[in-house]
């Protein structure tokens, strides 16, 4: 009996000691302050990177050119969000842009333009195109020296096609771009916009990728310029079906 009491007493002392040690550990002065400072440092680092990308966007547009562009202030996975090109002909064109940190204007870079589906249009929210589609991020895996532009258009019709062409020409004019490495893709409604873009100025683009969409534009300009167009769609796509792409392929091939 006495032995059992002794064992219970020892166990109680050990538990009490553990409780005291835990209390002392979590009550150390400066512990919370250190964690808070780490969080502040992380936030400041993200803000610094955003400011650097904004500065990189601004330094490539100066004077009258800068007056035509309003740089964004928020960053998402390396993209500077909601920049606005104020075009006298096509109105305000909202776009997100990824400019590699190494870009300094001393050598030519490739250009990739990605057109969103319905869920990524501008009225759906800033950055929704790159938050819901991975085309811009996948492109980075193929060519590291590449500027990626993700416009947030307002529809999938002629106005958006004209704005896409205007934005492409803006980057070709104001950035050091290799004209033989200009790529474009369109997903769903963005694919319809892409077909209208290619019907108007296919010579701007080296190659095009259309995913889960249909061809709304004319075929002849693409045939004449021999611009490569790649079609990707499920055989039983729930919205478009595969027949529109099969027809477009036959017309262009």
Where are these regions (language model features)?
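A domain-start/cap signature at the N-terminus of enzymes
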Residues: 2-109, 192, 197-200
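Active-site machinery of serine-nucleophile hydrolases
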Residues: 111, 115-165
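Short, solvent-exposed loop/turn and secondary-structure capping segments
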Residues: 108-109, 122-128, 161-162, 196-197, ...
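The feature captures the conserved acid-bearing segment of alpha/beta-hydrolase catalytic domains
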Residues: 206-253
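Loop/turn elements at helix/coil->beta-strand transitions in domains of secreted/extracellular proteins
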Residues: 107-111, 143-147, 178-182, 202-208, ...
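Primarily recognizes the serine-hydrolase "nucleophile elbow" in alpha/beta-hydrolase
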Residues: 173-174, 180-224
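Gly/Ser-rich "nucleophile elbow"/oxyanion-hole loop immediately N-terminal to the catalytic nucleophile
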Residues: 102-103, 107, 156-188
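Solvent-exposed loop/turn segments at secondary-structure junctions
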Residues: 117-121, 153-158, 188-192, 213-217, ...
